[in-house]
Amino acid sequence: MKGHVTEIFNQLSTVYEKTVDKEGLYNTEYERPAMLNELPKDLSNKKILDAGCAAGWYTEQLIQRGATVVAIDISPEMVNATKRRVVGNVNVICMDLEAHMPFTDNTFDYIISSLTLHYLKDWKHTFQEIKRVLKPNGTLLFSVHHPFTDISWTKEKQYYSTELIIDNWNKDGKTYEVPFYRRPLQYIINTTSRYFLLEKIIEPQPTQTFKEYAPEKYEVLLKRPQFLIIKSTNSA
């Protein structure tokens, strides 16, 4: 699974640079505005970990807001894409979010993870590491697939399991088989609250620009949210 995810996102790195970061409505006009709305516009003197940086879109945005950013991703090609995007301005590391993080305790003011955690089967070790390297009262902000949408993929007879799903992404005339884990809402909420103080649960709404470009998909998102955003605090 892990090796397959790495290889798939190595292949997708160019696609992210050319299209997803500029034209992907579910990113540009749905998930990203809602995520950025939860962050201060001025992040000067703040140190932030971009956990699962992909091609570096969030990394660049955080730098523009004044933050000192460390970006990590499991895909070497995504790491290279991020380095091309933010030349010389950030430390970009190829590493697995399920491994020990090479940072000292209480390093970061914020940890941001955009649409990444659903590629991990078990969040416990990852959250233990995030809690360790996040400063007291620091913020963890992450987005994942919404379980209400993911349940439509299930091959199981019940909702409550954590299930490996294969999604087919059609990009630039090619189909990519992208594996992820579907999990119930209670897992997301309870696992997060075991390590952090829940501050806000956000079900993002698409922008009016999304509606202009894709009115039918816009209406679907108003009835069935695709992503879920969790904002929490590293309480003592």
Where are the predicted features?
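Conserved class I S-adenosyl-L-methionine
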Residues: 1-43, 57-61, 78-81, 85, 139-168
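Class I SAM-dependent methyltransferase SAM/SAH-binding core
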Residues: 49-51, 55-99
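A short acidic, Gly/Pro-enriched loop at the edge of an enzyme's catalytic core
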Residues: 101-110
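A short SAM/SAH-binding and catalytic strip from SAM-dependent methyltransferases
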Residues: 109-124
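A short glycine-rich, Lys/Arg-flanked "PGG" loop and its adjoining helix->strand segment in the class I
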Residues: 124-139
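Short alpha-helix
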Residues: 178-202
